[in-house]
Amino acid sequence: MNLLVTSSLGVLLHLVVLCQADDHSELLVNTKSGKVMGTRVPVLSSHISAFLGIPFAEPPVGNMRFRRPEPKKPWSGVWNASTYPNNCQQYVDEQFPGFSGSEMWNPNREMSEDCLYLNIWVPSPRPKSTTVMVWIYGGGFYSGSSTLDVYNGKYLAYTEEVVLVSLSYRVGAFGFLALHGSQEAPGNVGLLDQRMALQWVHDNIQFFGGDPKTVTIFGESAGGASVGMHILSPGSRDLFRRAILQSGSPNCPWASVSVAEGRRRAVELGRNLNCNLNSDEELIHCLREKKPQELIDVEWNVLPFDSIFRFSFVPVIDGEFFPTSLESMLNSGNFKKTQILLGVNKDEGSFFLLYGAPGFSKDSESKISREDFMSGVKLSVPHANDLGLDAVTLQYTDWMDDNNGIKNRDGLDDIVGDHNVICPLMHFVNKYTKFGNGTYLYFFNHRASNLVWPEWMGVIHGYEIEFVFGLPLVKELNYTAEEEALSRRIMHYWATFAKTGNPNEPHSQESKWPLFTTKEQKFIDLNTEPMKVHQRLRVQMCVFWNQFLPKLLNATACDGELSSSGTSSSKGIIFYVLFSILYLIF
């Protein structure tokens, strides 16, 4: 009997040792940069391998501030990839201290300029050559972190058996200060950080069980715009296969500026910090001498006007990363032609109104007076002259009930969302689909049951992300069973699209997500209800933003009387009416 027990214990001990050896071999990966040791993390009823904080570039510190990234030099020994890395230096939202709704987007690790790292989640056992999905965070190009709880890749990687990567990139002036012509601060280095991370993934992901030929990049807001920018940029096109854009596209009005405007903002930053402005060299030297927080504290001062949904340091159309203007590239088909999946949320504007428009509060219904509505319109369309503002007001006012505070509130939500997210994305998708080979469009209109923001904010910008990353699968977070099912469905759509270029299962009996075509323009709702197919998302408003208003502003750009402050003249009103009639006719 004792011999049997001893023998059984020996076998058990041998199995434990073998399991530990298997765990160790799964967690130790030899990349082209060097060896990395990951960690085993629990996920639902199982576990997954995580490799956190792998460097892909040299730290952009000291004289490397504002410069293009340089590849990480190979290291000896084993890199400890068991904890999240630093977050990049950035503006921290302190509007609502202690409020989880806003603080969930703030950095959750120490901030540092040494921040160019990526994180990888790998199914266990390690796959042979599986699909790879690379996440690019949003944050208006002034904020964002790969380490946020809402971006935890373990649920999506585990549930859909994909390798999930999240990368980091410099934001604010650190990533997008642009003095065109200077090698010391060329601009767009945040986008080049992203590209360098994609290059690292391309060169190394096979060692983690991923297939470098089936990489899908996906992102939200500025991350979605970034994804679109890599579709456009010739230097990025070979580093991924497919793309998903959530609530952002490269042509959004806040997502880029001219090189001249980029330079003006860089000089204005220096002026705010008492730098010598005699030359680029002196300006850059001065800005490099400043502490990071000094730059962050004054970055909002460089904007040319008071506005909502505009950010200080963003990509510039430089002739290099972007060979020509975005519109000319879209018109000519000068972009990567592949399958894309993209969409928007129902209430894209509400979050931004809370941070700048008069009359809005998270602690009330935010019923908006007519006076506050008019002020909000001016902040929402800061580039428009008075006639343009009148056109926006006319388009979004219920003139049978123009003093209704709820309608005024919801009208501003629609103005900000249509102008900054929905209609730019619709313009992009229509242009892209003429040349691409498979497009799928969604409209996310489910408000989470546990959302802490007030009801009036609706289905908020950014709040589809938790469904994409599988948070409703976590029982402790108090989502409903229907929301868990929605999250599983969205994850499966995203992953199936990444694997095949089509979000639909080939032999499924469920309703099919139809292709978007320029003729029919079909899209689906994403919510807890059975699938519904619609056509021509926000078409009336998007014709206004994408066609009518630009022509109106162009036609009146040189007319001082029509652009003067105060109420438009009778001449302006007559001009507007005639222009509208002619536009509708022709």
UniProtKB/Swiss-Prot annotation:
Catalytic reactions on record = acetylcholine + H2O = choline + acetate + H(+)
List, from the UniProt record, the residues annotated as the active site of this protein: S221 (acyl-ester intermediate), E348 (charge relay system), H461 (charge relay system)
Q: InterPro entries given for it? A: AB_hydrolase_fold, AChE-related_enzymes, Acylcholinesterase_fish/snake, CarbesteraseB, Carboxylesterase_B_AS, Carboxylesterase_B_CS, Cholinesterase
Q: Which Pfam families match?
A: COesterase
Q: Mutating E220 to Q/D: what's the consequence?
A: Decrease in activity
- Quote the PROSITE patterns the UniProt record gives: CARBOXYLESTERASE_B_1, CARBOXYLESTERASE_B_2
The protein's superkingdom reads: Eukaryota
Q: Where is the lipid attached (GPI-anchor amidated serine)?
A: S564
Report activity regulation.
Inhibited by substrate concentrations above 0.5 mM.
- Cysteine pairs forming cystine bridges in this chain are C88-C115, C275-C286, C423-C542
Keyword Protease on this protein? no
Positions of the propeptide segment: 565-586
Tell me the Gene Ontology biological-process terms attached to this UniProt entry: acetylcholine catabolic process in synaptic cleft; choline metabolic process
Relate the outcome reported for changing H461Q.
Loss of activity
Q: What is the effect of changing S221C?
A: Loss of activity
Its EC number(s):
3.1.1.7
Which class of enzymes does this protein belong to? hydrolase
Signal peptide interval:
1-21
Q: Which GO terms describe its cellular component?
A: extracellular space; plasma membrane; side of membrane; synapse; synaptic cleft
Q: Which CDD domains match?
A: Esterase_lipase
**In its keyword annotation, does this UniProt entry include Hydrolase?**
yes
Keyword terms: Cell membrane, Disulfide bond, Glycoprotein, GPI-anchor, Hydrolase, Lipoprotein, Membrane, Neurotransmitter degradation, Serine esterase, Signal, Synapse
**The protein's role, per its UniProt record:** Terminates signal transduction at the neuromuscular junction by rapid hydrolysis of the acetylcholine released into the synaptic cleft. May be involved in cell-cell interactions.
Q: Which family does it belong to?
A: Belongs to the type-B carboxylesterase/lipase family.
This chain belongs to which protein, by name?
Acetylcholinesterase
- Annotated source species: Tetronarce californica (Pacific electric ray)
State the gene name recorded for this protein.
ache
